Amino acid sequence: MNQETHDKTPRTHGMDISLIERGVKKLKLKDETCCLQVKQFNFYYNQHTQALKSINLIIPERRVTAFIGPSGCGKSTLLRCFNRMNDLIDGARIEGEMLLNKQDIYGKNVNVSDLRRRVGMVFQKPNPFPKSIYENVAYGLRLQGVKSRRTLDKVVEKSLRSAALWDEVKDRLDDNAVGLSGGQQQRLVIARAIAIEPEVLLLDEPASALDPISTLKIEELIYDLKDKYTIVIVTHNMQQAARVSDYTAFMYLGELIEFGDTGTLFTNPKKKQTEDYITGRYG
């Protein structure tokens, strides 16, 4: 370990590591409840391209887990496996196991639509439907057969409040959602995802296209939501991973190099590859 990581306030990528020294008891994976488990997992885009190699990972319940690593390392591919978004790729196949609360996500009898209700996803670019703000949030509920206006009203308000958006849109719920700012659209998409009460929320670089103020609101929202949901976030932003996550996984060339509580991984990584990445030597 170089001298930089032994300073009282070591820095990685220009980041003050005191950001992640929260003054709380160090997290220990053995004390956590497992939500998602990955066992000897391989993913192939086709017969010639293997994107994930022998991944073993436990993601704890109601914590924020960040996936970091250089572009092309497999972090978004792994994220999309959790709700089988990669099923849409012709020729893709998997080996190994991926479990959600001990149930095999890739089991023969799994209803993929139900899985995607349980495991919601928010993408890098906000994708509101060309409908009203209200109907964006109510959409998933209507698909599930909810018709009661009273129930819909209640869930829409609750979801928008949870997404820290209610006060900004409560007087214009009938307006088209595409008229919202980028940051508001992303929070609306999160509200839409949590309206159907998923167990897990997957966030694929949710703030990368947003301005700093909108990014901060998304990060604050992630922190608030982890009391109710297991959250997995892919990010290229090292500072963001440090600020919002409890655990961090570093990936490189399709392999999981290191996983641990965020404070330890950033300040005292076990693997040289991890240290090289977080200190900016490559990536």
From Swiss-Prot:
Residue sites binding ATP per the record: 69-76
Pfam name, any one: ABC_tran
Coiled coil feature spans: none
Entry's Gene Ontology molecular function annotations: ATP binding; ATP hydrolysis activity; ATPase-coupled phosphate ion transmembrane transporter activity
Catalysed reactions, semicolon-separated: phosphate(out) + ATP + H2O = ADP + 2 phosphate(in) + H(+)
InterPro entries according to UniProt: AAA+_ATPase (IPR003593), ABC_transporter-like_ATP-bd (IPR003439), ABC_transporter-like_CS (IPR017871), P-loop_NTPase (IPR027417), PstB-like (IPR005670)
Membrane topology: Peripheral membrane protein
Enzyme class name: translocase
SMART domains in the cross-refs: AAA
Predominant place of localization: membrane
Known EC number: 7.3.2.1
Domain ABC transporter: 36-278
UniProt keyword terms in alphabetical order: ATP-binding, Cell inner membrane, Cell membrane, Membrane, Nucleotide-binding, Phosphate transport, Translocase, Transport
GO CC entries: plasma membrane
CDD domains in UniProt: ABC_PstB_phosphate_transporter (cd03260)
Subcellular location: Cell inner membrane
Family listed: Belongs to the ABC transporter superfamily. Phosphate importer (TC 3.A.1.7) family.
Role, per record: Part of the ABC transporter complex PstSACB involved in phosphate import. Responsible for energy coupling to the transport system.
Subunit-level organization: The complex is composed of two ATP-binding proteins (PstB), two transmembrane proteins (PstC and PstA) and a solute-binding protein (PstS).
Protein name, as recorded: Phosphate import ATP-binding protein PstB 2
Native species: Nitrosococcus oceani (strain ATCC 19707 / BCRC 17464 / JCM 30415 / NCIMB 11848 / C-107)
Gene: pstB2
